[in-house]
Amino acid sequence: MLRLSLPPNVSMGFRLVTLVALLFTHVDHITADTEAETGGNETTECTGSYYCKKGVILPIWEPQDPSFGDKIARATVYFVAMVYMFLGVSIIADRFMSSIEVITSQEKEITIKKPNGETTKTTVRIWNETVSNLTLMALGSSAPEILLSVIEVCGHNFTAGDLGPSTIVGSAAFNMFIIIALCVYVVPDGETRKIKHLRVFFVTAAWSIFAYTWLYIILSVSSPGVVEVWEGLLTFFFFPICVVFAWVADRRLLFYKYVYKRYRAGKQRGMIIEHEGDRPASKTEIEMDGKVVNSHVDNFLDGALVLEVDERDQDDEEARREMARILKELKQKHPDKEIEQLIELANYQVLSQQQKSRAFYRIQATRLMTGAGNILKRHAADQARKAVSMHEVNMDVVENDPVSKVFFEQGTYQCLENCGTVALTIIRRGGDLTNTVFVDFRTEDGTANAGSDYEFTEGTVIFKPGETQKEIRVGIIDDDIFEEDENFLVHLSNVRVSSEVSEDGILDSNHVSAIACLGSPNTATITIFDDDHAGIFTFEEPVTHVSESIGIMEVKVLRTSGARGNVIIPYKTIEGTARGGGEDFEDTCGELEFQNDEIVKTISVKVIDDEEYEKNKTFFIEIGEPRLVEMSEKKALLLNELGGFTLTEGKKMYGQPVFRKVHARDHPIPSTVISISEEYDDKQPLTSKEEEERRIAEMGRPILGEHTKLEVIIEESYEFKSTVDKLIKKTNLALVVGTNSWREQFIEAITVSAGEDDDDDECGEEKLPSCFDYVMHFLTVFWKVLFAFVPPTEYWNGWACFIVSILMIGLLTAFIGDLASHFGCTIGLKDSVTAVVFVALGTSVPDTFASKVAATQDQYADASIGNVTGSNAVNVFLGIGVAWSIAAIYHAANGEQFKVSPGTLAFSVTLFTIFAFINVGVLLYRRRPEIGGELGGPRTAKLLTSSLFVLLWLLYIFFSSLEAYCHIKGF
């Protein structure tokens, strides 16, 4: 009889660990029974067996009865090989989870038809979050355990084994007790993490406990020792039933079924938002796959699409504001960086802060363990390098263009009628600058005519070696006739290149090569403004759109059809849907003064930036009647411009002094004011000559043009909106964890990256790899390169990677099952004990790290512990349900019964179920205000909870081992 005597002051934990160690030591001294017919590691015996049976893949290591030294060597080889296989499974599971992340991120486009007939296109996620967590996510994290159970049964002539089922139960115990204990402890003191979707947690926790209760029922109550076909199939069919129940809880269908639901387009990423309310008079229709469907059709969108509740809409709005804030801060902090680089920096910060899926944390944990680096930092650094390299490539393309391009510096030129000549600049860019380039030019009439408005000009411009810019001039003819603005064209043509030029500068026709062409623009438009009229004043267009982030907007007021004299034109802003006074814009009013020959002035208005993602408000800018302010005394009389004037020093008009009319804003010295009156006009009528002069003067008076009132539409910032939209598209974790090509996968496989999980660095810059990173990389580089052959997640929307990865996991799991069984029989451990302790621990290590990272980084506890319960239920329904259904059907077809010994498994299941009730009860109690959440809390509460959960796991291992070796009676 095994006895344990320890001093009374030794802790309970130490007692348990010592007892387990003595138990395993005692096992080695038990005399092994001879190999039974069913195999070497017989489960019905109370002792382990040193006689190994042939595995599914691995043969028996002969001889069967080695010496003690050989036994230690064999056990070491099996153990190291098993650990190495666990590393391989972790890495291929990384690829598997990447494919799942890509698959569950797929979106579908739908069209919403509004009551007014307008349609809006938007996208929704195809996979419901809860459904994906219970199906693909759970399958991804538990694939080794599930496949081990199936492979063990199918590989041993459809007979029941201990390794697969015990691994599932042992893994469930490790997940429920050790992983949750770690998550509770790693949250910083004073902080808490709550489960957000508590309804889903209740459902999955209930199903998890029911799953193991059901195992006990079919093993010990319904048909003791026999698994019938209906029991196996029902176990499997509990899986979709569990998924449906969790989905119903997530969608709140059982209660909300009686509340009318309306759907509207959310402002964020085009998500569809569901909320309760009264039934509207008009129907909103939704079009899916080309068909328009009424939005209130019963259960239309439930389940087929992901409908986000109003809370999600609010979260999305906050996310947009947060993106805008991050972009502005980064722009101020890094003013020298390109916009693409700023987007990548913002992308890293947003990805670091957003809630992530279980798949992401699993991938992150595996890559940190194997020296593949922090996935977010690596992605940010890669994208930043791509942005810089693309910018450099574009610059190189321009600078290293082998073809010489010749073009005008600008496509439009303006000049006054009295300017004499207008200068046009021709640019040469690219190609070999040591060559000589020739280009012809020629003027062409538009509304202006050669000979009367401008001088016809043609010729050839020669760019000598090294020259990149030339200037040509065209003469402008002035007259005293009032005319509309006119234009003419100048064309470039016939570009040719020569490497040799004669002494006279003439092209040597024997050395012409076609390595030059015309660039854009190759035609220039020259507009001639008449200077014989005071001008017509107008805005460029009746409506203009401005971004709210413009700050100070500038609006041009054009002076066309003349530019003679000084003219004042008043302006003011008028409210529309946009409000002045600093709410949407600053009220502005004043006067513009056009000097003689000045043809354009600008009005400045300050626009207030509200940082709104969507905006459409209007106000108006209006110009008033223009006033001629400088004229001769005679012209003032002709135009009836009477009143006070001041003499303008140094100005003459046709030999006569020029006077400036006094306005309210002027404050001249009273003694300088001259009064011009029409007293002489009252005495005698105007002569015909004076009448003609008055008519001409009236024709030259400044007037308003077509657009005197400009409508200004303030919209959201185009650059800001496009940047945020681009950032939103980039903040898709599927883009981070997915791969696009085999080349990318192989580069990633042979690259060592820093494994520090430090997400506080806002720039996401990669650090140098540590010694541990290099060691883990070289230990796992074989697996990394091997699994780089798996199809990238880009193919078939992730399904190609999904299928190949699960096949590879199945193959490695078969090896793990054989290695674990051979390791156990080599040292005399039963399969059930080996599975509960070693295999369950090995398959759960990546999940442990993933949950630890999720607990510290996520805002909620769902990603760290919320999926543990669902995963445990899925393990039973898929792992045991599929395996036992296949075996039961096989034996039933042969007229036999599928026998399963209820002893060890039933005892472990019962023990786990009791402890699971305690675990869930403690977690729910921790939601009370004094602690505040399932994870974290005050240090004392954390230590007590974590210690309790670890103690439950040790007790589970201890009692399961005692029962397996018949030290206590099971079922």
UniProtKB/Swiss-Prot annotation:
<feature type="topological domain" description="Cytoplasmic">
    <location>
        <begin position="926"/>
        <end position="942"/>
    </location>
</feature>
<dbReference type="GO" id="GO:0071313">
    <property type="term" value="P:cellular response to caffeine"/>
</dbReference>
<feature type="topological domain" description="Extracellular">
    <location>
        <begin position="223"/>
        <end position="228"/>
    </location>
</feature>
<dbReference type="GO" id="GO:0055001">
    <property type="term" value="P:muscle cell development"/>
</dbReference>
<dbReference type="GO" id="GO:0098719">
    <property type="term" value="P:sodium ion import across plasma membrane"/>
</dbReference>
<feature type="binding site">
    <location>
        <position position="479"/>
    </location>
    <ligand>
        <name>Ca(2+) 4</name>
    </ligand>
</feature>
<feature type="transmembrane region" description="Helical">
    <location>
        <begin position="72"/>
        <end position="92"/>
    </location>
</feature>
<dbReference type="Pfam" id="PF16494">
    <property type="entry name" value="Na_Ca_ex_C"/>
</dbReference>
<feature type="glycosylation site" description="N-linked (GlcNAc...) asparagine">
    <location>
        <position position="41"/>
    </location>
</feature>
<dbReference type="GO" id="GO:0001892">
    <property type="term" value="P:embryonic placenta development"/>
</dbReference>
<feature type="transmembrane region" description="Helical">
    <location>
        <begin position="168"/>
        <end position="188"/>
    </location>
</feature>
<dbReference type="GO" id="GO:0060048">
    <property type="term" value="P:cardiac muscle contraction"/>
</dbReference>
<keyword id="KW-0109">Calcium transport</keyword>
<keyword id="KW-0597">Phosphoprotein</keyword>
<dbReference type="GO" id="GO:0086064">
    <property type="term" value="P:cell communication by electrical coupling involved in cardiac conduction"/>
</dbReference>
<dbReference type="GO" id="GO:0030018">
    <property type="term" value="C:Z disc"/>
</dbReference>
<dbReference type="GO" id="GO:0007584">
    <property type="term" value="P:response to nutrient"/>
</dbReference>
<keyword id="KW-0966">Cell projection</keyword>
<dbReference type="GO" id="GO:0014704">
    <property type="term" value="C:intercalated disc"/>
</dbReference>
<dbReference type="GO" id="GO:0005509">
    <property type="term" value="F:calcium ion binding"/>
</dbReference>
<dbReference type="GO" id="GO:0005516">
    <property type="term" value="F:calmodulin binding"/>
</dbReference>
<feature type="binding site">
    <location>
        <position position="612"/>
    </location>
    <ligand>
        <name>Ca(2+) 5</name>
    </ligand>
</feature>
<comment type="similarity">
    <text>Belongs to the Ca(2+):cation antiporter (CaCA) (TC 2.A.19) family. SLC8 subfamily.</text>
</comment>
<dbReference type="GO" id="GO:0009749">
    <property type="term" value="P:response to glucose"/>
</dbReference>
<dbReference type="GO" id="GO:0014069">
    <property type="term" value="C:postsynaptic density"/>
</dbReference>
<feature type="modified residue" description="Phosphoserine">
    <location>
        <position position="389"/>
    </location>
</feature>
<keyword id="KW-0050">Antiport</keyword>
<feature type="binding site">
    <location>
        <position position="479"/>
    </location>
    <ligand>
        <name>Ca(2+) 1</name>
    </ligand>
</feature>
<dbReference type="GO" id="GO:0005886">
    <property type="term" value="C:plasma membrane"/>
</dbReference>
<keyword id="KW-0406">Ion transport</keyword>
<dbReference type="GO" id="GO:0010763">
    <property type="term" value="P:positive regulation of fibroblast migration"/>
</dbReference>
<dbReference type="InterPro" id="IPR032452">
    <property type="entry name" value="Na_Ca_Ex_C-exten"/>
</dbReference>
<feature type="binding site">
    <location>
        <position position="453"/>
    </location>
    <ligand>
        <name>Ca(2+) 1</name>
    </ligand>
</feature>
<dbReference type="GO" id="GO:1901660">
    <property type="term" value="P:calcium ion export"/>
</dbReference>
<dbReference type="GO" id="GO:0006816">
    <property type="term" value="P:calcium ion transport"/>
</dbReference>
<feature type="binding site">
    <location>
        <position position="531"/>
    </location>
    <ligand>
        <name>Ca(2+) 2</name>
    </ligand>
</feature>
<feature type="repeat" description="Alpha-2">
    <location>
        <begin position="840"/>
        <end position="876"/>
    </location>
</feature>
<feature type="topological domain" description="Cytoplasmic">
    <location>
        <begin position="250"/>
        <end position="798"/>
    </location>
</feature>
<protein>
    <recommendedName>
        <fullName>Sodium/calcium exchanger 1</fullName>
    </recommendedName>
</protein>
<keyword id="KW-0677">Repeat</keyword>
<keyword id="KW-0472">Membrane</keyword>
<dbReference type="GO" id="GO:0098703">
    <property type="term" value="P:calcium ion import across plasma membrane"/>
</dbReference>
